[in-house]
Amino acid sequence: MNTTHGALSALILAGTRPGAPDPMAQACGVSHKAILPVGGTPMVLRVIRALQATPGIGRIAVCIDNPAVLDGLLPSDIEIVPSSPNGPSASVLAGLTQMGTPLLVTTADNALLRPEWISEFLAKCSPQTDVAAAVAPEAVVLRDVPGTRRTFIRLADMAFSGCNLFLFRTPASLQVAALWQRVEKNRKHPLRIAWLLGPGILLRAVCKKLTRAALCKRIGALSGTTAELVPLSDGRAAVDVDKPADLELTEKLIAADAAAKT
C-alpha cells in the first residue's frame, strides 16, 4: 500500500475489556495496562512514538474508556476516541466511524512496535485488499525469540502468531469489524463460532487442510470484502505484553536492542 505523507490515520486500542480487571494492570498497580511502564516508558507512549516515526502516518488516536488516566502522558496532537464497553471490535467500529479509512489499528500493549515493521506491513498489503492483518510465521518467531511461548494458529500451509497490527483500508472493511463483533460476542461458545464460519471451514481446520487463502476467502465471503494475512519478517512483532513473562521478555528485548546500538 502506498501512502502519501499524512494520508493514513492510526488508532491505538487502550481500553479495558468488559468484566474482570486486566490481571497485568492489577499486578503492576495501575488502572489500565496501557500505562504500565516498560523500560521506564508507558507502553502506550512507546506505540505512539513508533507510529509518529512511520512515514505516511498522520492522525493518531488512542481509544480508551477513561481518558483521564492519560493526563500528562500524551503529546498534544494525539486524539482520543471513546472506547466501547462492548469490546475491542466495537471500539474499532467507533474508531472507523470517527476517523474513516484507511485506518491502521494496533494495541497499547504492542510495546515493541517498530516503524520498520509498520512500513513492511503497509508495503506488502495488496492494493486490492479491504482489510489485512499482520502475522509472524512460527519459524520466524522461534528464530528471533527462541524459547518464547506464543499462541500459534496452525493452517495447512502456515503456522503463525498475530502481531496486533491491522489495516482497514476501505469503507467496506467496516463489515469485517462487524463480523469480528459477532465472533467476539460468541467467544465463549465455540460451536456458535464454528457455525458462523461454516461447517466446511471447520472440517478443513480439524483435518489440517485449511489454507491461508481459504481462510481469507471465507472471511471475505462472510463480510463481503477481500481480506489477507500479511507475514512479517521479524518474529519479535508477535510479542505483546499479556502476562508477566511477556513484560520480562519485552524489557529484555528492548535492553538488548539498546545495547546493540551503543
Label each residue range with its predicted role:
Residues 1-29:
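N-terminal nucleotide-binding beta1-loop-alpha1 segment
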Residues 9, 58-60, 102, 130:
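Residues at the starts of beta-strands that form the adenosine-phosphate
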Residues 27-45:
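Short catalytic helix/loop segments, enriched in acidic residues and glycine
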Residues 50-57:
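Short, acidic, metal-binding catalytic loop of nucleotide-sugar glycosyltransferases
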Residues 72-105, 112-113, 120:
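Short phosphate-binding loop-to-helix
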